[in-house]
From Swiss-Prot:
Endosome-associated protein that plays a role in membrane receptor sorting, cytokinesis and ciliogenesis. Involved in the endosome-to-plasma membrane trafficking and recycling of SNX27-retromer-dependent cargo proteins, such as GLUT1. Involved in the regulation of cytokinesis; the function may involve PTPN13 and GIT1. Plays a role in the formation of cilia. Involved in cargo protein localization, such as PKD2, at primary cilia. Involved in the presentation of the tumor necrosis factor (TNF) receptor TNFRSF1A on the cell surface, and hence in the modulation of the TNF-induced apoptosis. One of its GO terms (biological process) is cell projection organization. This is Endosome-associated-trafficking regulator 1. Belongs to the ENTR1 family. Expressed in the colon (at protein level). Tne N-terminal domain is necessary and sufficient for basal body localization and ciliogenesis. It is found in: Cytoplasm; Early endosome; Endosome; Recycling endosome. The lineage of its organism: Eukaryota, Metazoa, Chordata, Craniata, Vertebrata. The modification Phosphoserine is found at S18, S147, S243, S247. Found in a complex with ENTR1, PTPN13 and GIT1. Interacts with PTPN13 (via the FERM domain). Interacts (via N-terminus) with GIT1 (via N- and C-terminus); this interaction is direct. Interacts with NOD2. Interacts (via N-terminus) with IFT88. Interacts with VPS35. Residues 240-250 have a biased composition (Low complexity). It comes from the Eukaryota. Residues 173-182 have a biased composition (Acidic residues).
């Protein structure tokens, strides 16, 4: 991916946390070779000053979703803590217990103090003790002494970079701070500085580059290398082609001015590119986060639907199981009823066979009765004639007896009347005797 080279095996968060921001004295020593992310000039200071009293204000935006995914929302680089957000939208980070106001007023390496001690240092010290070789600059960049000399980059850094001696012993303080912050020894370098030391960058593509290329196009992540050449080499024209050999202070001023302007331009360009990349990555991250939240909500909805469906299927399964059990019970009952019906049918068949035998017997009896009916009729007629004759004899005898009874009844009536009159006859006789 064109733009800034990534170290292999380092995520964007670990790269942001591996930024090595030096303290103020070491910062002024190594500012000629170590790039800063943001440089703020104090008010009322000359813009073309080679040492314009840079006040380090670390501006590196790390999105909160990335910190939340890692579980770390507190920056702690070395001894410092992240302060509240500045009006420009960046986080102004204070490192250690130093204050920017104190550094601006009582900094022995400010431009004001430098002008006071410049003439004395140039007159008393040897030029060899003032300007170190490339080994010192390489050591200030954190490179090994065994690494090959730096190659020419795209920013015109092919000359030897000066390293000014620290009269107050700030280098020892820097070494002590580097020993204390061994966990943050790695330094973030833009592609221009990293290309000057290609041995430190492996040939393979890091996982971070594939991660960023997934969300951004190569044109969006283009670094300072894709900028026009006039923006990078504009400050070269400000360097005077020739300087008086007998005025080392003028040579040093011109050299420092060109160096400071070049670094200011390159750092401003790299800062703008990083800011654009940061905003694009922030937008991409917001989109990815919203998409992830939508997908998570969709997954939760699908899980709820799946759970409801599973509960419904389980209830349906229990209902179906109960129905199957009921059907099995009904089948058992029907089987028992079928067995009973078969037994009843067998009994009915036996009864039918008995009834058929009885019917056959009755038919034979009817036939026998029909055959013997003619002989019985003649006998019956004869018996009826005899009975009629006997009845006639009885009737005749009955009439004669009836007549005798009627005559006897008349005699009986006469006797009854005579008996009634006997009482009267006796009473009359009694009356006659009394008289």
């Amino acid at each position: 991916m064109s733009g800034y080279q990534r170290r292999p095996g380092a995520t964007p968060l670990s790269r942001a946390r591996s930024l090595a921001i030096p303290d103020a004295p070491a910062f002024y020593e190594r500012r000629s070779c170590l790039p800063q992310l943001n440089c703020e000039r104090p008010h009322g200071r000359d813009l073309d000053s080679p040492f314009f009293g840079i006040r380090p204000a670390f501006m590196c935006y790390v999105p909160s979703p990335v910190l939340a995914s890692v579980g770390d929302t507190d920056f702690g680089y070395g001894k410092g803590k992240c302060s509240k957000q500045s009006p420009s939208g960046a986080h102004g980070t204070h490192f250690g217990d130093d204050r920017f106001e104190d550094l601006e007023e009582a900094n022995p390496f400010s431009f004001r103090e430098f002008l006071k001690t410049k003439n004395l240092g140039l007159s008393k010290e040897d030029p060899a003790s003032r300007i170190y070789a490339k080994e010192a600059s390489r050591h200030s960049l954190g490179l090994d002494h065994n690494s090959p000399p730096s190659q020419t980059g795209g920013y015109g850094l092919e000359y030897q970079q000066p390293f000014f001696e620290d009269p107050t012993g700030a280098g020892d303080l820097l070494d002590e701070e580097e020993d204390e912050d061994t966990g943050w020894s790695g330094a973030y370098l833009p592609s221009a500085i990293e290309q000057t030391h290609p041995e430190r960058v492996p040939a393979g593509t890091s996982p971070c580059s594939t991660y960023l290329s997934f969300f951004s196009t190569p044109s969006e992540l283009a670094g300072p290398e894709s900028l026009p050449s006039w923006a990078l080499s504009d400050t070269d024209s400000r360097v005077s082609p020739a300087s008086p050999a007998g005025s080392p202070s003028a040579d040093f001023a011109v050299h420092g001015e060109s160096l400071g302007d070049r670094h200011l331009r390159t750092l401003q360009i790299s800062y703008d590119a990083l800011k654009d990349e940061n905003s694009k990555l922030r937008r991409k991250l917001n989109e990815v986060q919203s998409f992830s939240e939508a997908q998570t909500e969709m997954v939760r909805t699908l899980e709820r639907k799946l759970e409801a469906k599973m509960i419904k299927e389980e209830s349906d399964y229990h209902d179906l199981e109960s129905v199957v059990q009921q059907v099995e019970q009904n089948l058992e009952l029907m089987t028992k009823r079928a067995v009973k019906a078969e037994n009843h049918v067998v009994k009915l068949k036996q009864e039918i066979s008995l009834l058929q035998a009885q019917v056959s017997n009755f038919q034979r009896e009817n036939e026998a009765l029909r055959c013997g009916q003619g002989a019985s009729l003649t006998v019956v007629k004869q018996n009826a004639d005899v009975a009629l004759q006997n009845l006639r004899v009885v009737m005749n005898s009955a009439q004669a007896s009836i007549k005798q009874l009627v005559s006897g009844a008349e005699t009986l009536n006469l006797v009854a009347e005579i008996l009634k009159s006997i009482d009267r006859i006796s009473e009359v006789k009694d009356e006659e005797e009394d008289s």
